Design a protein with these regions (language model features):
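Intrinsically disordered, low-complexity N-proximal targeting/linker segments that flank membranes
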Residues: 1-53, 60
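Short conserved micro-motifs at the rims of enzyme active sites and ligand-binding pockets
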Residues: 61-64, 90-95, 126-127, 158
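Short, well-ordered coil↔helix boundary/capping segments
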Residues: 68-71, 75, 87, 105, ...
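Histidine-centered nuclease catalytic patch
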Residues: 42-76, 92
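Alpha-helix initiation and N-capping motif
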Residues: 19, 49, 93-94, 108, ...
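C-terminal, helix-dominated tail/subdomain
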Residues: 1, 101-106
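Short Cys/His-centered divalent metal-binding micro-motifs
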Residues: 73, 77-102
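C-terminal, well-folded lobe of enzymatic/effector domains
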Residues: 104-181
């Protein structure tokens, strides 16, 4: 058995076990809150609940003609508090990162560490005036990182799919990740 990263493209349903499992794996890896930099914990924020939110905001993606199939995928989502999500709003990542750094007094290095804790390459979010091609680079990079994490946790190898393989042909059921998490 192997883990096919194309499966991640199909995870868009918030109630699906596999969708939740990927978010849980990112939490388990020690992701930190985008605004405070504090360790993310589903139960520690009380009035500021943790949920899975967009990294490239939905509004930004819609304005740039990116399909919902891509922007609503778990690849473009990560655990964030409600206040972090509100601060991000619909701005491009480079803009909301600057806003968070300014308001919270975070250095770029500290913010980059937060992004890396979410399996995000900071350089891919810091692109000034990002384009669809920049979103695509971010998306493919994060998909590879999430696939590597899922494969490591399950003990499976990451499959390198051929171009003709479709996500519906994936042999491995990501729902099994929930049991491993």
């Amino acid at each position: 058995l192997s883990f096919n990263p194309l499966r991640l493209d199909t995870l868009r349903n918030r109630i699906a076990a596999a969708y939740k499992a990927i978010g849980a794996l990112v939490l388990r890896e020690g992701c930190r809150d985008f605004v405070t930099g504090a360790p993310a914990d589903l139960y520690a924020f009380g009035a500021d609940p943790m949920d899975i939110h967009h990294i490239f905001p939905r509004d930004w993606c819609r304005r740039h003609g990116i399909s919902a199939d891509r922007y609503d995928s778990i690849v473009n989502k990560t655990p964030l508090t409600a206040s972090s999500n509100r601060m991000i709003g619909g701005a491009a990542p480079c803009d909301y990162l600057a806003l968070v750094e300014g308001r919270q007094g975070l250095s770029a290095e500290a913010m980059d560490a937060v992004l890396r804790s979410h399996l995000i390459d900071p350089a891919l979010l810091r692109v000034s005036s990002p384009t669809v091609a920049d979103f695509d680079r971010f998306y493919e990079d994060r998909k590879a990182r999430l696939a590597t994490l899922a494969a490591r946790v399950t003990g499976l190898a990451v499959e390198v799919p051929s171009p003709e393989v479709q996500a519906t042909e994936v042999e491995f059921d990501l729902d099994d990740v929930e049991e491993a998490a």
